[in-house]
Every structure is written in structure tokens, then in C-alpha cells.
Curated annotation (Swiss-Prot):
Lineage: Eukaryota, Fungi, Dikarya, Ascomycota, Saccharomycotina
InterPro entries, A to Z: V-ATPase_G
One GO process term, biological-process aspect: Golgi lumen acidification
Protein's name according to its UniProt entry: V-type proton ATPase subunit G
GO cellular component: fungal-type vacuole membrane; Golgi membrane; proton-transporting V-type ATPase complex; vacuolar proton-transporting V-type ATPase complex; vacuolar proton-transporting V-type ATPase, V1 domain
Modified residues (N-acetylserine): S2
Assigned keywords, A-Z: Acetylation, Hydrogen ion transport, Ion transport, Membrane, Transport, Vacuole
Matching Pfam families: V-ATPase_G
Gene3D superfamilies: F1F0 ATP synthase subunit B, membrane domain (1.20.5.620), Single helix bin (1.20.5.730)
Main location: membrane
Length: 114
């Protein structure tokens, strides 16, 4: 009968050890799931933060491009106004030169004809 008690004790100890191992595995799996969930939450919050920073950066720098465009356009308009003013001053001289050239042709031999 002592053999039966010894075997029963061993079986009971094996069963308890199996339960302890099962609990440890379940605990580890639960911890892994919790860690994955926490990591996903942290990643989402980090992504939201970076998206917010990107939007702020875009808004901050989008206005700068508009200002540069306005300055460039003003510079171009100023240069065009200056060119038109110079053209208006020189218009009479150009017309005189054209009329003289048409009325008084000069006979020259072209350099390729020689």
C-alpha cells in the first residue's frame, strides 16, 4: 500500500507541477498580449503627435511660400514697368533709325560674296 501512496503522491505532485507550468505559460501569454497592446497604443499616440507636428510645420511654412511669390511678382512687375518706360523713351529714336535705313539704302558687298 505504501507503493500506491508513493505513486499517488508522485502523480499529485506531477499534476501540481503541470498546473504551475500552465499558469506560468498563461501568465506569460497574457503579459505578451498586454505588451503588444501597450506598444500599439504608444505607436498610435506617437503617430498622432508626429502628424500634428507635420501639420503645424506645413501651416507655418506654407505662408512663407506665398510671401515669396508675392515678392517675386512685385519684383517682376517693377522690372516690366522699367522696361516699358525705357522702351517708351527709345521708341522715337528706333523709328528714326528704321526710316533712315529704309529711305537711304547703302550699297555694300556682302562678306560671303567675296
Amino acid at each position: 500500500m505504501s507503493q500506491k501512496n508513493g505513486i499517488a503522491t508522485l502523480l499529485q505532485a506531477e499534476k501540481e507541477a503541470h498546473e504551475i507550468v500552465s499558469k506560468a505559460r498563461k501568465y506569460r501569454q497574457d503579459k505578451l498580449k498586454q505588451a503588444k497592446t501597450d506598444a500599439a497604443k504608444e505607436i498610435d499616440s506617437y503617430k498622432i503627435q508626429k502628424d500634428k507636428e507635420l501639420k503645424e510645420f506645413e501651416q507655418k511654412n506654407a505662408g512663407g511660400v506665398g510671401e515669396l511669390e508675392k515678392k517675386a511678382e512685385a519684383g517682376v512687375q517693377g522690372e516690366l514697368a522699367e522696361i516699358k518706360k525705357i522702351a517708351e523713351k527709345k521708341k522715337d529714336d528706333v523709328v528714326k533709325i528704321l526710316i533712315e535705313t529704309v529711305i537711304k539704302p547703302s550699297a555694300e558687298v556682302h562678306i560671303n560674296a567675296l
